Amino acid sequence: MNSHNITNESLALALMLVVVAILISHKEKLALEKDILWSVGRAIIQLIIVGYVLKYIFSVDDASLTLLMVLFICFNAAWNAQKRSKYFAKAFISSFIAITVGAGITLAVLILSGSIEFIPMQVIPIAGMIAGNAMVAVGLCYNNLGQRVISEQQQIQEKLSLGATPKQASAILIRDSIRAALIPTVDSAKTVGLVSLPGMMSGLIFAGIDPVKAIKYQIMVTFMLLSTASLSTIIACYLTYRKFYNSRHQLVVTQLKKK
């Protein structure tokens, strides 16, 4: 197996790629120079911290620390997912439950089936991938659900006046929101290997792993991303649609935080 270690000097030279982005922003007057510098600086600091934390966790190889790190990943994913919602507030709890349950079930299946072992260097990276994908899916679900509720207030009110429960009145909206949230993951699965070489597969090949073995891991990743996204969006949607109704089963659009 061929190995290649990137040096600090080569990493510093690679920073020139960021300079290119800054120059383009300056020339085209995009006013993104500060944002680019801030995002790059923040990414460097975050990755350095995470790198040393993971190095410690991997060396200790403690189950409780591994679980704590998985929960930390799910916490951050839920926090960012609820921030992506443009139409209602206080969605963190539902986001955390949805992402944690979705990721937990997927990880349990992978571990029990023998696809991965319950060791930090396997569980934590996998948890990061599935939680990140679930975060995006849940955010899309929230936005679509909020848009649909606002645009279809009249139809919802009519269904409620005819005796429908909030769940019945929201059934089509929930279904369409879940579907819209899953489309990016499904489309990604359709084009994997044809349009792009995904992260895990590329990383393994770059590290010198046999491409056929790398493909097997990528197939596993495709399965787990679809599973987690499906579970997380369904849970998040069914926990969230109730925010649009009061205790009398009336639609309360004033609770939305439309921007």
What are these regions (language model features)?
Residues 22-23, 51-53, 74-78, 104-112, ...:
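Alpha-helical transmembrane segments of multipass membrane proteins
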Residues 187-212, 216:
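Non-cytoplasmic
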Residues 212-241:
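Hydrophobic alpha-helical transmembrane segments of polytopic membrane proteins
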